[in-house]
């Protein structure tokens, strides 16, 4: 078992084993269908990372109800961001047509999302 420095900088804590399982949507009711997967006991301890709209990402982090509305595609799991044990987290890909350039603003929003995910883990 390996150890990492704890949050206080002095103690050590066991490293958590994290598995990343990429998925591709190939149809309903099977791996890749986040709406189906998140309801399966096999994935009860999984954090689903989905493509989010920047507007709804910001709404969620501002505790606005629209930040928990289900979206299309893999954003169907957006409501699972809520509660005391979040099961989903979004990474903004823009609004509408998506981000066209990796500007300082875009990098900042993506970094915010990755920081939030890191804290969940």
What is the meaning of each model-derived region?
Residues 1-121:
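Macrodomain-like recognition of ADP-ribose-binding/processing modules
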């Amino acid at each position: 078992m390996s150890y990492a420095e704890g949050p206080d900088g002095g103690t050590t804590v066991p490293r958590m084993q994290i598995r990343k399982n990429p998925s591709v949507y190939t149809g309903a009711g099977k791996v890749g269908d986040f709406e189906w997967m998140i309801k399966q006991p096999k994935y009860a301890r999984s954090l689903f990372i989905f493509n989010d709209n920047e507007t709804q990402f910001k709404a969620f982090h501002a505790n606005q109800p629209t930040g928990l509305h289900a979206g299309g595609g893999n954003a169907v799991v957006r409501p699972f961001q809520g509660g005391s044990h979040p099961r989903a987290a979004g990474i903004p890909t823009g609004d509408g047509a998506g981000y066209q350039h990796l500007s300082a603003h875009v990098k900042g929003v993506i970094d915010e999302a990755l920081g939030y995910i890191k804290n969940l883990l």
